[in-house]
């Protein structure tokens, strides 16, 4: 039996709903409601719209996993060329949005692609958008230990993983890799580490979250490198249509 949504501790008022947007589908989470839909399923779209309109929801936050972001240091950012930042990362430059990190160091430019707020008829709710990378970056900025060298952070999802690298606590690298199994995960991980001239014996891989479904990945990595984990209530496993995503929950990293 697959894992179900694991409810984290929350400090957010119950009037807020979260919608996780992926490439081919999205997922609503609000109180006891947990439902996924494609962007073309009219029956599900109507069902989700009714849930949001007929409930006490007064704000909806969209968390975007649906396209690769472009990450630009604030001092080099030019708001006038947002579309150009995305041209090398993604084929979609529709509904471009941007975040700025909590530490005011980087701008995150991304395509929202589908404007679900209009599709779902959310004209009375307060709407906000954030890219998944921005949440991840803000989270790590709050928990990273002081280090004199490179720090490697990895978050595994079903079918992909993300790697972030810091040098002396300064962010320097992010990428997402699609993978089939733990062997592909190992290949891409050490390909990146070797490009940064990392010493397998000296440096350590830090996994964001520790979940039983990814034990094979952890065990394989531990044969070639030291590993560690960040574990706390800020992480959830979401099971969307048989796929598992490790999500930084906004409830725990925002006021």
PLM regions: where:
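Hydrophobic/aromatic-enriched cytosolic interaction surfaces used to assemble or bind macromolecules
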Residues: 1-255
């Amino acid at each position: 039996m697959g894992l179900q949504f694991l409810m984290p501790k929350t400090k957010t008022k119950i009037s807020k709903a979260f919608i996780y947007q992926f490439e081919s589908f999205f997922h609503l989470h609000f109180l006891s409601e947990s439902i996924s839909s494609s962007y073309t399923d009219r029956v599900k779209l109507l069902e989700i719209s009714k849930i949001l309109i007929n409930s006490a929801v007064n704000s909806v936050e969209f968390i975007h996993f649906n396209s690769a972001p472009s990450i630009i240091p604030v001092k080099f950012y030019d708001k006038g060329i947002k579309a150009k930042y995305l041209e090398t990362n993604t084929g979609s430059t529709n509904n471009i949005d941007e975040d700025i990190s909590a530490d005011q160091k980087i701008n995150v430019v991304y395509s929202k692609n589908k404007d679900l707020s209009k599709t779902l008829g959310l004209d009375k709710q307060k709407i906000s958008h954030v890219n998944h990378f921005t949440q991840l970056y803000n989270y790590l900025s709050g928990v990273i230990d002081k280090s004199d060298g490179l720090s490697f952070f990895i978050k595994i999802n079903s079918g992909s993983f993300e790697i972030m690298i810091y040098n002396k606590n300064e962010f320097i690298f992010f990428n997402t890799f699609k993978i089939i199994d733990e062997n592909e995960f190992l290949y891409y991980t050490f390909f990146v580490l070797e490009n940064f001239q990392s010493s397998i014996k000296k440096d350590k891989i830090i996994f964001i979250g520790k979940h039983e479904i990814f034990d094979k990945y952890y065990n394989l990595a531990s044969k070639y490198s030291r590993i560690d984990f960040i574990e706390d209530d800020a992480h959830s496993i979401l099971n969307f249509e048989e796929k598992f995503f490790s999500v930084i929950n906004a409830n725990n990293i925002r006021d």
